[in-house]
């Protein structure tokens, strides 16, 4: 089961009680105090781990506690400190205070560690309270209480490219074709019920991450369908690939306008993201119809077919791609970076799609450094 939001109560450990003890040695009458200090309570830490992909290992309303410090001992021996509790979370997890709603930590990088709550200090043993007027103190400090906080863990997946489309538009087929992801694929709507990440390799040494989320329908930002729960998983993505089905019963203009409207209504940031458009299922449209269909769609989004790319597009199909993915060299973010018909079933234009998306990703990485 994919879990992306959990509420937890977390408590650091209580400090150990200081010890009341006196020297007991042969020929020593009424020995002085030698009570040791209590151990420090265990801390609460968060750690980001690439090997964790969901929050499903947390039980609902779970209470996570660090160990308490051990009491001090005689002979001025301090108690053992409580073992710290390290909470493992996947990359993309935000730690949010339930009372103030403040984002405390944004866990993004594998190996990132953050101290959340320190354990209570151990109490002082009676050795510390010896004075000229009190040679045998019978008092030792109690340990400090640990701290308890209510938090929410909110997982937002981290990807370079987010796929956005109506249900059954071919998102899962595409991500399984270009990456190592293996989502469920079937010929019915809402096959994808949880977000999926896939690594798209470009040659031997380059790659980018693609995210597939459940299909969007009109009204998704208001809670209709499954998309509202998962749109937030592409909030961190810099690039959106809108997928429009050439063979759908839905009008092409209706598809792209609805998708863009839903994304923009959900998040201003998403609405202003760089984007491209893939026209899916090109293999399902007759050859004598597809050129007119693609050209008419390009007119809808305000672009015209080009032929100046070196990405080895299928020469039998019209396509559009901007001259550069770099805004300093003429990239226009008001229009799609590219519009291309594709077929995952026949691999038509799949390689150009991968490389064109990588051009956008690479430019973003350069300017985000």
Curated annotation (Swiss-Prot):
Span of domain OBG-type G: 159-362
One Pfam family, short name: MMR_HSR1
Residue sites binding GTP per the record: 165-172, 190-194, 212-215, 280-283, 343-345
EC number(s) per entry: 3.6.5.-
Residue span of region Disordered: 126-146
Cysteine-cysteine disulfides: none
Domain Obg residues, every copy: 1-158
Enzyme class, broadest EC rank: hydrolase
Reported cofactor(s): Mg(2+)
Record localization: Cytoplasm
Secretion signal span: none
GO cellular component: a single term: cytoplasm
PROSITE patterns: G_OBG (PS51710), OBG (PS51883)
Keywords: Cytoplasm, GTP-binding, Hydrolase, Magnesium, Metal-binding, Nucleotide-binding
Biased composition (Polar residues): 128-138
GO MF term (any one): GTPase activity
HAMAP family noted in UniProt: GTPase_Obg
Stated role: An essential GTPase which binds GTP, GDP and possibly (p)ppGpp with moderate affinity, with high nucleotide exchange rates and a fairly low GTP hydrolysis rate. Plays a role in control of the cell cycle, stress response, ribosome biogenesis and in those bacteria that undergo differentiation, in morphogenesis control.
Assembly behavior: Monomer.
UniProt-recorded name of the protein: GTPase Obg
